[in-house]
């Protein structure tokens, strides 16, 4: 082996070792207790190097270290790069930390990036009920009705967990409440699947009431029969049967139609400008 080739290989190995130490330092796995992120980068650690499935920036978002995220971005970390799971850094940050989300968006992170299952960061923020991340993503242009591989929207993901805060914000931004996924489920039916487990909380009940106001009318029965899992709970079954049997009133159907006609925007601002009495504005905003 020539001396020049040996030097090149040694240089590559040294950079790889530094980059691995960078990942470990960010994750607080201190194999080298005196390491710090800035010194490792200054010494030649590659801020975009992948170790296994991890990249440094993804790791910083996993541990919710907004200062480290900003430092890595300043040093050239690629904000929309994919890790070994085909996820961007924003997918990780959206689950956990608004500060990281804000920094990433400031540096050009794509709020509509898709992972391997076509999930967006907004899907994950809604699922984890990280309401401030939901709001930050929507304010930065995230698609409120983005579809994953199963044609579920962020609203569906929030509803299946009974995440009242996230559901409320998504509805404020015009989320479609009657969307149907590939196996016939709607956001409200996803929430019902949670309620039938018998572990419903007051917040989940409030989430159901909010979705019911937004949808106007819904149907869970097939050929006039409630799903078996609903029928097992007589009290819930009776309540849902009454709601499904009642046709949507003109008032509730008009509310749904008006909200939909306003399009994908922040509805509280849009409704504020309508020439309507205050009571009707509150009705349109699902406040009664």
Curated annotation (Swiss-Prot):
UniProt keyword annotation of Methyltransferase present: no
Similarity remark: Belongs to the ankyrin SOCS box (ASB) family.
InterPro entries in the record: Ankyrin_rpt, Ankyrin_rpt-contain_sf, ASB8_SOCS, SOCS_box, SOCS_box-like_dom_sf
Oligomeric and partner information: Interacts with TBK1; this interaction promotes TBK1 proteasomal degradation.
Post-translational modification: Phosphorylated by TBK1.
Domain notes: The SOCS box domain mediates the interaction with the Elongin BC complex, an adapter module in different E3 ubiquitin-protein ligase complexes.
Summary of the function given for this chain in its UniProt record: May be a substrate-recognition component of a SCF-like ECS (Elongin-Cullin-SOCS-box protein) E3 ubiquitin-protein ligase complex which mediates the ubiquitination and subsequent proteasomal degradation of target proteins. Inhibits IFN-beta production through the IRF3 signaling pathway by targeting TBK1 via 'Lys-48'-linked ubiquitination, leading to its proteasomal degradation.
Protein name: Ankyrin repeat and SOCS box protein 8
GO CC entries: cytoplasm
Gene Ontology biological process terms from the UniProt entry: intracellular signal transduction; protein ubiquitination
Pathway: Protein modification; protein ubiquitination
Domain of life of the organism encoding this protein: Eukaryota
ANK repeats: 52-81, 85-113, 117-146, 150-179
Sequence ranges assigned to domain SOCS box in this UniProt record: 235-288
Keyword terms: ANK repeat, Cytoplasm, Phosphoprotein, Repeat, Ubl conjugation pathway
Residues recorded as bearing Phosphoserine in the entry: 17
Pfam families: Ank_2, Ank_4, SOCS_box
Protein location: Cytoplasm
Keyword Repeat listed: yes
